C-alpha cells in the first residue's frame, strides 16, 4: 500500500484448507467448495488468519482520532480479492469484543453473505429499500454469535445503484447507527460498478481489500482518486494472500505477537506483490 499512500491495516496470510477445517465445514453443513475462510474467526480462532483479522480490528478501532469508526464500507478494486471474507471476519471480531455489530450485504449484484452464514435470502435489504419497512425481519441473528446481526441482500434487483443511493438507504444507515456500535457493509468491486462510490459517501470510511500478486495498483489508484473526489475517506488497505514466510505469528500463553516485514519495490510495479521477510 506504499504505492497508494495509504496505511496497511492488516496482512492476511494465505490459509491452507486443513483436515480440521474440512471437518468443521462438514459439521456445520457448509459446502467444501465455498470460501473456506469466510468464518475463520469463529471456526479456527487460534489460526494465524484469525489473529490477523483481530489485528485488523485493532487497526480500525485506532484509525480515527476521537472515537472508533462506526459505519465501515469494505470493498476491493476487482472481483475475487477477498472483500466479503474480510467484511465478515471484521464484523465477527468486532462482535467477539462484546459489542453489538451488524453486517449488511450491499453487493446487490452478486450477494454472498447469506450463503456463508447459512441464511435464506428470499427477503432482505432490497425488500426494505423497495418499501417493506419491517426492521425486525430485516435483522437476522447468527446463532453462534448473538452480538452479530446480519442483513442479507434479498432478491437481486434490476436497479442496485438506484436503491443504494436512495433516501431509504441513508435512513436505514442512520437507524442502524443508532442501534449498533459498528455497521459493516460489503459492496461490489469498486471499479466495475458505481455502488461502492455511492456507499462511500454514506459511511465513516472505507477499507480497501487487495490480493497479493493479483491486485492492480493502477485500478486501486483510480478508486482512491474517485473516493477522494467524493470527499470520502479510506482508512487503509487489507492485503490478502500473504505467504506464511512473510508473516510471523507467535503465541505466548494465549496472547499473540504480530509482526510483518515488506520489501521495497519501484513505482512501476503493476501488482501489489507478496511481502517477504527481510
Predicted region positions:
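Conserved catalytic-core segment of NTP-binding enzymes
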Residues: 1-5, 118, 130, 140, ...
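Residue-level preference for the first positions of well-ordered beta-strands
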Residues: 71-75, 100, 148-150, 182-184
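Short, conserved active-site loop motifs that form the nucleotide-linked donor/cofactor pocket
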Residues: 147-148, 235
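Short boundary/hinge segments that flank catalytic cores
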Residues: 1-99, 106-110, 116-122, 158, ...
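Short acidic/glycine-enriched loop/turn segments that link adjacent beta-strands
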Residues: 145-147, 193
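N-terminal glycine-rich dinucleotide-binding loop that anchors FAD/FMN and/or NAD(P) in oxidoreductases
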Residues: 119-137
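Structured cytosolic domains appended to multi-pass membrane proteins
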Residues: 104-108, 130, 148-155
